[in-house]
Amino acid sequence: MPAAKGGASLQPVASGVFHSVVHPTNGTATIYQAEDGSRVLRFTNFRTTNGPNVHVYMVAADDANDNSTVRRAGFIDLGPIKGNVGDQNYTFGPELDLSKYRAVSLWCKRFSLNFGTAPLAAEHAMSAN
């Protein structure tokens, strides 16, 4: 688990497994939250195809199995992907409504393609299963 600024611990609030859409994609996406409300989206055991101008989107949908869902549902851009292989973190604030934005998509802006998506489930819902 990543540590917050100042060494404070982060608690997992949502997690999901990537599935491929137009390119092979796998790994886990987990959102951690600090006491101050700041959040970290962490990819672990992550791998996708290398591509031009790929960004990390939080999508306002339960899942995004195609390209049109991302465009139709709406999204928040967390910035360019840090690499196509390996663990990585993306920080964002408490203003992003996780009850609305329930999927992580890897979006190629150049070709308008969804490389892969991780539908997120609340951590308490996951542990209840």
Regions found by a protein language model. Give the residues of each.
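Transition segment at domain starts
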Residues: M1-D36, V70-A73, A125-N129
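N-terminal post-signal-peptidase region of extra-cytosolic proteins
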Residues: N26-A29, R39-T44, D63, Q88-Y90
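Short, exposed beta-strand-loop hairpins at the edges of beta-sheets
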Residues: G93-T117
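C-terminal end-helix/capping segment
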Residues: F115-N129
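Extracytoplasmic
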Residues: P24-N26, S38, G51, S99
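An anionic, turn-rich surface loop/hairpin at beta-sheet edges
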Residues: D66-G93
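Solvent-exposed coil/turn segments that connect beta secondary-structure elements
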Residues: A34, T44-F46, V59-D62, G83, ...
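Beta-strand signatures of extracellular beta-sandwich domains
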Residues: H55-Y57
